[in-house]
Amino acid sequence: MALIPDLAMETWLLLAVSLVLLYLYGTHSHGLFKKLGIPGPTPLPFLGNILSYHKGFCMFDMECHKKYGKVWGFYDGQQPVLAITDPDMIKTVLVKECYSVFTNRRPFGPVGFMKSAISIAEDEEWKRLRSLLSPTFTSGKLKEMVPIIAQYGDVLVRNLRREAETGKPVTLKDVFGAYSMDVITSTSFGVNIDSLNNPQDPFVENTKKLLRFDFLDPFFLSITVFPFLIPILEVLNICVFPREVTNFLRKSVKRMKESRLEDTQKHRVDFLQLMIDSQNSKETESHKALSDLELVAQSIIFIFAGYETTSSVLSFIMYELATHPDVQQKLQEEIDAVLPNKAPPTYDTVLQMEYLDMVVNETLRLFPIAMRLERVCKKDVEINGMFIPKGVVVMIPSYALHRDPKYWTEPEKFLPERFSKKNKDNIDPYIYTPFGSGPRNCIGMRFALMNMKLALIRVLQNFSFKPCKETQIPLKLSLGGLLQPEKPVVLKVESRDGTVSGA
């Protein structure tokens, strides 16, 4: 029996031509950076450099920065990605040319009606949403929301106390994840849940389904390698956000909105109420008001952007405080001085706490949740003498820049003093970008910081944290697409009144 099929010459020729065409399709963009004289790792047909992500985005970016210097090019599938680390170039991309050239983020799959969410929307649609939503995130509005957030800080303390009383080490992801979910579902959807003690609540179950998300899972990798699948999936009504979950949340917002419109009493200030108010405001006449579907999309994206990030950063902060007891003690002393006898924090007292701000900023330097910032180049452009063709994704590797010894002495060390009044003026705002920069930075930055600081104050007023045998030291990062610890942070919790967990 012949090992090679006995095919006609025409068939062999057709097969050879098909293979050549397939190879050309799989590599058609891969010569771009070589042609532009930009260094970078060698791509594979179809895959580009995505196999290099097996160590995680952070390590890939750190290695490339070390090997290639200020600028390098690589390929996600066939998508050319240009990494830049020069602060002047970063400023041009994020600020100076934001509206004209670098307005949009990279599309990440079929998103359905979520294309109206502020983090995903593009061009004029994004500008309109930003104008409508910016008043929702002012310091004045945030001040009015502090009592809602503080209420869940008290729930967090109760949950931690109960965990501490068991005498076992505490997995911080559980308690901080519940706090984060409670605050965001309350402010975005107007529902009150103690999610740690009510895991069966339909809101908790649906929100958790929404958050099972990893940019390195096979679905996202397949649409990275074969981007032509995205419009096909859109036509087939397939969406990266689970439809059963978005339908549930749409109905919930509709119900809550109807209930609030029927009730003539003054409602509490939360994101949902502020968005409902903006729909009826005369001030929005220059822009088309938010539609009901757009309102739902913003509520969902607030959960999506805020849940994982808040709980992860709080876990990272507590890990650093537990492994740096001198910093923890100094922070507790500041909190006790500003708020004696465990007085509840207010918006103004939080702003008085300089050392708290330093600790949070230094943690965000070591663990920037947005490991990368990306903008799509809308047209051929030259910036700082470098030509960037239309369609290239420009990427700023925040994690690598936050640990670059050129800008930070002993970059791997946790040193809050970097952000003291005396030192912070030396920090380049385009090297330290935990929330992005420019017009398209994180719109919820103030809210996220206040949310985390209120939690930290309440927790540190009541507890001290120490490493235990289950604590992973040094902490390792997950290789997934989100910046998280490889293993959940587990610590011993001591009540400042005397109770000990994990002893």
Curated annotation (Swiss-Prot):
Description of what induces expression = By drugs, such as rifampicin.
Give the matching InterPro entries: Cyt_P450, Cyt_P450_CS, Cyt_P450_E_CYP3A, Cyt_P450_E_grp-II, Cyt_P450_sf, Cytochrome_P450_3A
Which Gene Ontology CC terms are recorded? cytoplasm; endoplasmic reticulum membrane; intracellular membrane-bounded organelle
Q: Name one Pfam family in it.
A: p450
Tell me where in or outside the cell this protein is found. Answer: Endoplasmic reticulum membrane; Microsome membrane
Annotated phenotype, changing residue 293 to P? In allele CYP3A4*18; exhibits higher turnover numbers for testosterone and chlorpyrifos
Biological pathway: Steroid hormone biosynthesis; Cofactor metabolism; retinol metabolism; Steroid metabolism; cholesterol metabolism; Lipid metabolism; fatty acid metabolism
Location (main, coarse):
endoplasmic reticulum
What does the PTM comment of the record read?
Answer: Polyubiquitinated in the presence of AMFR and UBE2G1 and also STUB1/CHIP and UBE2D1 (in vitro).
Instruction: Please give the annotated consequence of changing residue 363 to M.
Output: In allele CYP3A4*11; unstable form
Q: What additional remark is attached to this entry?
A: Chimeric transcripts, characterized by CYP3A43 exon 1 joined at canonical splice sites to distinct sets of CYP3A4 exons, have been detected. All are possibly produced by trans-splicing. The chimeric transcripts exist in 3 different combinations: CYP3A43 exon 1 joined in frame to CYP3A4 exons 2-13, CYP3A43 exon 1 joined in frame to CYP3A4 exons 4-13 and CYP3A43 exon 1 joined in frame to CYP3A4 exon 7-13. The longest chimeric isoform (CYP3A43 exon 1 joined to CYP3A4 exons 2-13) exhibits 6-beta-hydroxylase activity, while a shorter isoform (CYP3A43 exon 1 joined to CYP3A4 exons 4-13) does not.
What's the disease link here?
A: Vitamin D-dependent rickets 3: An autosomal dominant disorder of vitamin D metabolism resulting in early-onset rickets, reduced serum levels of the vitamin D metabolites 25-hydroxyvitamin D and 1,25-dihydroxyvitamin D, and deficient responsiveness to parent and activated forms of vitamin D.
Q: Which PANTHER family match?
A: CYTOCHROME P450 3A4, CYTOCHROME P450 FAMILY 3
Q: What is this protein called?
A: Cytochrome P450 3A4
- To which species is this protein native? Homo sapiens
In the UniProt record, the gene name given for this protein reads: CYP3A4
